Amino acid sequence: MKAHKIFWLNLAAIIIISIVVSGDMFLAMKWEQIHLKDGLKKVLSTYPIKNLETLYEIDGHDNPHYENNDQDTWYIESSYSVVGSDELLKEDRMLLKVDKNTHKITGEYDTTTNDRKNATDSTYKSYPVKVVNNKIVFTKDVKDPALKQKIENNQFLIQSGDLTSILNSNDLKVTHDPTTDYYNLSGKLSNDNPNVKQLKRRYNIPKNASTKVELKGMSDLKGNNHQDQKLYFYFSSPGKDQIIYKESLTYNKISEH
């Protein structure tokens, strides 16, 4: 009888300890997420950069491994892609090079279209542009007035978005490596998020499409300056091709594509 009582007391103690430890671990993980979100808020609060020409006076994350001929250069890239089950069907891409030495912004707007049934019908076009007085200007004549207006009105989310609002979602996971300063955010966003609303309106994306977001970059999470980062929005609707919007801001190196 005594041994039986001791067994149940030990079992109860183990259960209580497990509950306490689990609770402490849950609180620790929750506190870590709050701390990381606060750090990311400092980083994202440095946006929007409404005038891209202000980047002439802004230094980024310095890296001694970058090529010397790329020093003091910002690269801004965005792309809107329609992706089938296993292939890229359509992509519009803007890439700008912000040269801090010459105070010039140049780049190109590319369009790619792949026919799902006939690969030989794929098309690629590139339109060279520059930025003058914070406005996109063509360096060669464009015949299509609709395309011309579309490109001239192009804006990046770092110019017109509300990036800190991403952190308001309750369905996010944030990780940060203090050794490398690499961070990653991923999760879901509601249709009420202002960035989601803006992208759906701009690209005529179905209003009921679900949205996943991913943010990657390098930062000490202190918000001291603009850092390299990549932002992804994934829009999905049942029976529809996936739509992906990507945007990146990098310093001293050519943006990956």
From Swiss-Prot:
Q: Which UniProt keywords apply?
A: Cell membrane, Membrane, Transmembrane, Transmembrane helix
> Which ranges does the record mark as transmembrane?
6-26
Q: Which family does it belong to?
A: Belongs to the staphylococcal tandem lipoprotein family.
The membrane-topology field of this record reads: Single-pass membrane protein
Pfam families given in the database record: DUF576
Q: Which organism is it from?
A: Staphylococcus aureus (strain NCTC 8325 / PS 47)
UniProt-listed Gene3D superfamilies = 2.50.20.40
As given in the record, the signal peptide range reads none
Q: What is this protein called?
A: Uncharacterized protein SAOUHSC_00172
InterPro entries linked to this entry = Csa (IPR007595), Csa_sf (IPR038641)
Q: Does the keyword Cell membrane apply?
A: yes
The listed locations are:
Cell membrane
Q: Which GO terms describe its cellular component?
A: plasma membrane
